[in-house]
């Protein structure tokens, strides 16, 4: 709403600095509150030697369009009414009217650098549902979808037109061509957005309105059409496409991960969505690379297209810090290693390959030597034969060396040599 009035020059500064930002304002007519809003702009100017002041008011929902926010809504069972309540809880006294089935959102929703109004407008546009406001009350009251508001008032038909472009654009809504015929009406009666009336046996709904006070007389201009033809074209989160958001792993299951996004820290929403984890290699038969991150690991969530539900976790971002006085696992870029929280590790370095599992391990040097060690035991077993072939073979035991087959035939070396068998031949 804009209000223009004549002002005295000496009052301009007092008015300009004396008005508080978002100061409430209202318009009454015939004992009825026609408009309630907040002051969002003030301008003083001269026209034909007359000094004028213009005040601009917007409905209270302008508070929802002031701050850019980033957060995720991971609970796919949340209903549309639950989403509205979650958003509107930041605005005391805010109310809403949901005029479409209260279904579960059924997908991941991400609000990324959007105001609450921009976000809700985008979400409901996916259902072809417009977002509107009720002007005739103080505070915030929004319409999600087109409500049923019956009524009748005096009017005069001013114009009739149809947009062929809208007929084609909104074909997916299921409305017919006649639903996109606009009726322009003039009236002295103030009606709200989505108000309805009967015209030639059909119900028309206000989709656009304009009021103007001229010489003490209020002129109202309305554009109405069939409710079935009032919709919002889907808006997609193009600002999300190609970005990667930081987070940390909470839980791992199969090839899926549950994460907490850093941007959700101020909001505390439930982290219940399972994201697919993109491995280095995967095929339909299950072959490829399976190495999942661990709880607590830092990760990035990538959004490859305009559909937030297609998001996937692409990699882990290391926050490793070298231990003081210890060996830095990332100290030498020439050494590539793979390890897990259980202590197993494989390293590929300039000198060879090293594999360890805490108290046992294997080393293959570039020099040609292979070392196998274990603090408990080392077992070499084959269904067929085990062959040792070398220029020299040395077998050492701290207390004894024993070679025995399952029949009990063999040799034992302690401080003495003991040979056992059904028959022992010594030449």
How does the language model describe each region?
Residues 12-95, 108-109, 121-125, 134:
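Surface-exposed cap/loop segments at beta↔alpha junctions
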Residues 17-21, 190-192, 292-293:
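Short, well-ordered loop/turn sites that connect or cap secondary structure elements
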Residues 28-33, 90, 200-204, 302-309:
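Short, charged beta-turn/beta-strand-edge "cap" motif at the junction between a beta-strand
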Residues 34-44, 202-212, 247:
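Short beta-strand-centered aromatic/proline hotspots
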Residues 47-48, 78, 82-97, 101-228:
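Extended, domain-scale alpha-helical bundle/helix-rich regions
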Residues 60, 77-97, 250-272:
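Glycine-rich, acidic and aromatic/proline-enriched surface loops and short helix-turn segments
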Residues 87, 123, 133, 266-267, ...:
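Right-handed beta-helix
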Residues 205-212, 216-348:
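Exposed beta-strand/loop interface patches that mediate assembly or binding
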